[in-house]
Amino acid sequence: MSITAEKKQELIKKFALHENDTGSPEVQIAVLTERIRNLTEHIKANKKDLHSRRGLIGMVNKRRKLLNYLKRESEERYRKIIEALNIRETSNESK
């Protein structure tokens, strides 16, 4: 369900803006996306796990807010991250 420390470090290294970057929107979005994908697989196998489903909804909302922020601040960085992570652009993100 959760991601390994190695996978998290790999994502941080790939999306970091500089060497010690762990908190930029790109890194946070990448880590959240990996957690969302893992939790989605868990929920597919455990349909009655409502507590995990609620956590998933919270993660998706947090990622959407970060994507909205990134789109407001830098359209280029926003486009790059959604293409790299293969995330759909929804109409809610433009509001």
UniProtKB/Swiss-Prot annotation:
HAMAP family, alphabetized: Ribosomal_uS15_B
Protein family: Belongs to the universal ribosomal protein uS15 family.
CDD domains recorded: Ribosomal_S15p_S13e
Gene3D superfamilies: 6.10.250.3130, S15/NS1, RNA-binding
Keyword line: Ribonucleoprotein, Ribosomal protein, RNA-binding, rRNA-binding
Protein role: One of the primary rRNA binding proteins, it binds directly to 16S rRNA where it helps nucleate assembly of the platform of the 30S subunit by binding and bridging several RNA helices of the 16S rRNA.
Assembly information from the UniProt record: Part of the 30S ribosomal subunit. Forms a bridge to the 50S subunit in the 70S ribosome, contacting the 23S rRNA.
Cellular compartments per GO CC: cytosolic small ribosomal subunit
GO biological process: translation
Classification lineage: Bacteria, Pseudomonadati, Aquificota, Aquificia, Aquificales
GO molecular function, one term: structural constituent of ribosome
Keyword Repressor part of the UniProt annotation: no
InterPro entries: Ribosomal_uS15, Ribosomal_uS15_bac-type, uS15_NS1_RNA-bd_sf
Ribosomal protein keyword on record: yes
Record's protein name: Small ribosomal subunit protein uS15
